[in-house]
Structure formats: structure tokens, C-alpha cells
Curated annotation (Swiss-Prot):
Disulfide bonds: C3-C16, C10-C21, C15-C32, C23-C30
Superkingdom of this protein's organism: Eukaryota
UniProt key word Ribosomal protein: no
Protein name per Swiss-Prot or TrEMBL: Omega-agatoxin-Aa5a
Role according to the record: The toxin blocks voltage-gated calcium channels in rat cerebellar granule cells (IC(50)=200 nM).
The record's note on its domains: The presence of a 'disulfide through disulfide knot' structurally defines this protein as a knottin.
Subcellular location: Secreted
Species lineage: Eukaryota, Metazoa, Ecdysozoa, Arthropoda, Chelicerata
Gene source species: Agelenopsis aperta (North American funnel-web spider)
Entry's family note: Belongs to the neurotoxin 02 (plectoxin) family.
Length: 48
């Protein structure tokens, strides 16, 4: 049930503030999903 706790605390993780996250059972923590622009390093170009 540690996984459920990780999901609940996910909102408290800054990087998860506006994105989905998944639970990493092995590490017993919450992993934030990256935006596509983060994977390719193009986030800055998308900002107005």
C-alpha cells in the first residue's frame, strides 16, 4: 500500500504539480512524467 501513499503525496512534489505521475513500486516513490518538450529540450522555445 506504500504505492497508494506515493500517489497521494504526488501533489506535494513540485515537478508533479501540473503533470501526471506514476508510482515506482521498486523505489517506493512517485515518478513524474516528463513533457515531450523536456525530453527534447525544447520547452524554452514554447514559452511566449
Amino acid at each position: 500500500e506504500a504505492c497508494a501513499g506515493a500517489y497521494k503525496s504526488c501533489d506535494k512534489v513540485k515537478c508533479c504539480h501540473d503533470r501526471r505521475c506514476r508510482c515506482n513500486i521498486a523505489m517506493d516513490n512517485c515518478v513524474c512524467k516528463l513533457f515531450y518538450c523536456e525530453l527534447f529540450g525544447t520547452c524554452d522555445r514554447l514559452k511566449p
